[in-house]
A protein has these predicted regions:
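Hydrophobic alpha/beta core scaffold segments
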Residues: 559-563
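N-terminal localization/anchoring segments of enzymes in phospholipid and broader phosphate metabolism
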Residues: 1-534, 552-556, 568-588
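Active-site glycine- and acidic-residue-rich loops that bind
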Residues: 544
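Cofactor-pocket helix-loop regions in the catalytic cores of large enzyme subunits
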Residues: 539
Length: 588
């Protein structure tokens, strides 16, 4: 049915669907009912999301266009080249929307005494201050370069701001480059005035003429390149005894820094001549160069800008602070570990705190009857109490096994570092499978009791990340069910033995049983016809079999509702939806 389903409009391209998701993030920044500082943060999130999209998805399609030009996407029938063309066309207006939203937010912040200022707006004393600041704090850490036969074009690190300057000397043109050091703060406030600030790259632009004082400066712009980050692991066998996956990942991260450029962003319009010069140097096409006319190319400072306001004003311009509550099923001060031995506990993040789970691991680390703790880890906070408690458990003589997924996108280095810390403490570290990422969120505590052992199992939908548990909606079940515990024990044994085809009584485990069982449950609702009901909540929906089954259910009269955060390859229907399409809701 795959060909027919896209020809009939029942599926859509995943990349274009992702851009629609990010457009919804941008819409939050455009919404005047959203507090001003939150709007600015949404602009920064939109920008960061788009960076990762180009690094991974556009990077992957660029490779595919070169290696498999005739291969067509199963959900839209488009080749990689056709997908890239549509992506570039869809992204261009998003830049314009971001610029407009930034101009509005920036103007409103100025009214709240947070004013982004240009060099042209400074008086003479302020100019003198910025010149001293440049000479003492910025110039000493700069590494400018003029590209010529003796100074070849350097490697440009991705997502790092640079200044490009078109220079002239004795009728010969040269390209000058100034990397913006990461050690410099993104913004600088004027002296005795915590209301007006300049962007560091704007200061560098202003002093580019003095940096290249031997040349005439013809044009200049801030730019940033985005590199393909979709790097496959090398050809060494994944399970080779001679090769530690951690070492392979470290090599992959080094390789990622030198991959092809897939996007160039400019901060101001440049002449066609200068643009052509950049084309040749970066080896990109015209449609891969994007212009940000108003918004800074990097906006991470949005998350700390409010710190310069008074407490009262910052509160007025921000969402009310969200504080997760004590779980309703667990009275304050009560041990989750001991409670779970008596009854199941369901935690709902972020509405309820993750702290009881963390304290359960801490308690297990110091509980004499606890024999072992086993857990899967995909993403962790940069400062993780969970790691501290797992290390304590190992140091206290518990058998601690951690299955840590080193290939969690853009968390690779973080996970490498944590795996080393856990291993040093005596934890047994395993990495998973060659062709699959381990995305399960499961923890098993084994406890010796009179007459045998008891299991306490936690199964959840969200990462063991103390930061994102305050932001993302997830559920976490903690149970002492013997059958679930036995399944969990078998799961960890299978992971340690690289056995994907384990058999389980209660747990549904991808890729062998999760999808088939969900499709079977949906068949049961299809058999009920108009009395059937299906409610699904996803991060993303891209699976063709699932989309076809949802289409089948809708055609059978089943009421189908979906709540989807990100990509949805089943296109939106009108509301109420026609009989052959499920109803979907998108959340940000």
């Amino acid at each position: 049915m795959t060909d027919a389903i896209w020809n009939q409009g029942y599926t859509q391209n995943r990349e274009l669907s992702w851009l629609e998701f990010n457009a919804r993030v941008l819409a939050e920044a455009e919404d005047e009912t959203v507090p001003l500082l939150e709007r600015f943060k949404f602009l920064a999130i939109f920008t960061s999301n788009l960076d990762e999209f180009f690094m991974i998805r556009v990077g992957s399609l660029t490779d595919m266009a070169a290696l498999e030009p005739n291969r067509r996407d199963t959900k839209s029938g488009l080749t990689a080249e056709e997908q890239l063309s549509r992506i570039y066309a869809a992204v261009e207006p998003l830049y314009a929307r971001r610029d407009a939203a930034f101009r509005d937010v920036d103007a409103r912040l100025a009214q709240e005494d947070l004013c982004r200022t240009s060099m042209d707006e400074l008086d003479s004393s302020e100019r003198k201050y910025i010149k001293r600041y440049f000479n003492t704090m910025i110039a000493p850490v700069l590494s400018p370069q003029v590209v010529d036969s003796h100074h070849p074009f350097p490697h440009l690190e991705g997502k790092v701001l640079h200044i490009a300057v078109l220079l002239s000397h004795k009728k010969n043109e040269r390209l000058g480059l100034i990397p913006v050091p990461a050690s410099l703060p993104p913004i600088t406030f004027l002296p005795n005035d915590k209301r007006r600030y300049l962007m560091t790259e704007d200061i560098l632009l202003a002093f580019a003429d003095s940096i290249f004082e031997m040349y005439d400066v013809l044009e200049k712009t801030v730019f940033c390149v985005t590199r393909n980050a979709d790097v496959p692991l090398d050809d060494e066998p994944f399970g080779s005894e001679q090769v530690d996956l951690r070492k392979k990942m470290e090599r992959m991260l080094r390789q990622r820094r030198r991959m092809a450029i897939v996007r160039v962003e400019l901060s101001r319009p440049v002449s066609s001549h200068f643009k052509e010069c950049l084309h040749k140097r970066f080896e990109v096409t015209d449609e891969q160069i994007f212009l940000s006319r108003s918004a800074p190319l990097r906006m991470s400072y949005a998350f700390s800008l409010g710190d310069y306001l008074s407490d009262g004003r910052r509160s007025r311009l921000s969402d009310p602070p969200f504080i997760p509550q004590q779980p309703a099923m667990l009275p304050a001060g009560q041990s989750l570990l001991k409670t779970a031995l008596q009854r199941d506990v369901l935690l709902s993040y972020p509405y309820e705190s993750m702290e009881p789970f963390l304290q359960m691991i801490r308690e297990a680390a110091n509980d004499p009857p606890v024999l072992s703790v086993r857990i899967t880890i995909y993403r962790l906070a940069s400062k993780a109490k969970l790691v501290e408690y797992l290390c304590a458990a190992a140091e206290n003589g518990k058998d601690v096994t951690v299955l840590i997924e080193l290939r969690a996108r853009f968390d690779e280095q973080n996970n490498i570092d944590w795996s080393e810390r856990l291993e040093e403490a005596g934890c047994k570290i395993i990495y998973g499978f060659e062709d699959y990422k381990v995305h399960s969120k499961i923890c098993l505590i084994t406890r010796r009791e009179r007459g045998g052992v008891r299991y306490i199992t936690q199964v959840g939908t969200g990462n063991y990340n103390e930061k994102t548990a305050r932001q993302y909606t997830d559920v976490s079940l903690v149970t002492s069910s013997e059958s679930i515990g036995m399944d969990a024990a078998q799961f960890f044994n299978n992971m340690a033995m690289s056995n994907l085809n384990g058999r389980y009584n209660r747990l549904l485990v991808a890729p062998t049983s999760l999808k088939n069982n969900i499709l079977s449950l949906m068949d049961g609702e299809i058999a009920k016809g108009s009395d059937g009901y299906i409610l699904l909540k996803f991060n993303s929906l891209t699976d063709i079999d699932m989309i076809e089954k949802l289409h089948e259910a809708s055609c059978a009269g089943v009421t189908v509702e979906m709540i989807i955060r990100g990509i949805c390859c089943a296109p939106p229907a009108s509301h109420p939806p026609p009989a052959d399409r499920p109803d979907r809701k998108s959340v940000v």
